[in-house]
Regions:
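C-terminal cap/loop subdomain of S1 sulfatases and analogous C-terminal strand-loop tails that border
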Residues: 94-100, 140-143, 148-197
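Active-site-proximal cap/lid insertion segments
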Residues: 1-85, 89-136, 149-152, 156
């Protein structure tokens, strides 16, 4: 895999804080997020290809380590004889930029690279091994799905959707929309407010 890259002009229609990441020493002193949130990701993202390749190698090393450790967890479930009755979900809270759009790490830049994250589910007897699913799912669905799998009534105040029918292949989708929250000053009149789909 090659490091991602920035394409000239791709930030032309984006909020100004996006383009500042292409500067060597951007000034974010006048930028504030609501609620006193930090400016995570608001810095220069200029890196040479050697640094990007080093970051990519480090990232792959971390992925390999996580793969090894998840394997140990699954082996332990097998050894204890509870693998067949245990729902395992492995995922993350966000993606990671490795040069895509000229960005590194993460931050308040909501491209698909940050939002479309992997998820692996193992639930023998219900979720077919090796099955793939491209349906939209949200992390808010996980607690509802876990309660449903355990046969525990879902409290009415929980807003997630049960994903078990989707994971088992009995449904094509559980939801047709999701929401990702960005703490920034945008209004309905903002030229930077975008809705895709």
């Amino acid at each position: 895999m090659e490091p991602g890259q920035y394409y000239e002009g791709e930030l032309d229609d984006m909020p100004p804080q996006y383009a500042k990441t292409r500067e060597a020493n951007p000034d974010y002193t006048n930028y504030r997020e609501e609620g006193g949130q930090g400016l995570h990701g608001f810095h220069s993202h200029l890196h040479d290809e050697v640094d990007l390749r080093r970051s990519l190698a480090c990232y792959y090393g971390m992925v390999s380590l996580i793969d090894q450790e998840v394997g140990r967890i699954l082996d332990t479930l097998d050894r204890l004889g509870i693998a067949e009755e245990t729902l395992v979900l492995f995922s993350t809270d966000h993606g990671h930029y490795l040069g895509q759009h000229g960005l590194i790490a993460k931050g308040a830049f909501h491209y698909e690279d940050l939002l479309r994250i992997p998820m692996v589910v193992r639930y023998p007897g219900l979720v077919p091994a090796g099955a793939r699913c491209d349906a939209l799912q949200c992390q808010v669905d996980w607690p509802v799905t876990f309660l449903s799998a355990a046969g525990i009534p879902v409290p009415g105040l929980m807003q997630g959707l049960n994903q078990l029918p989707l994971w088992s292949g009995d449904a094509d989708q559980a939801r047709n929309a999701g929401r990702r929250h960005l703490r920034a000053r945008l209004s309905a009149a903002s030229p930077y407010l975008r809705i895709k789909g």
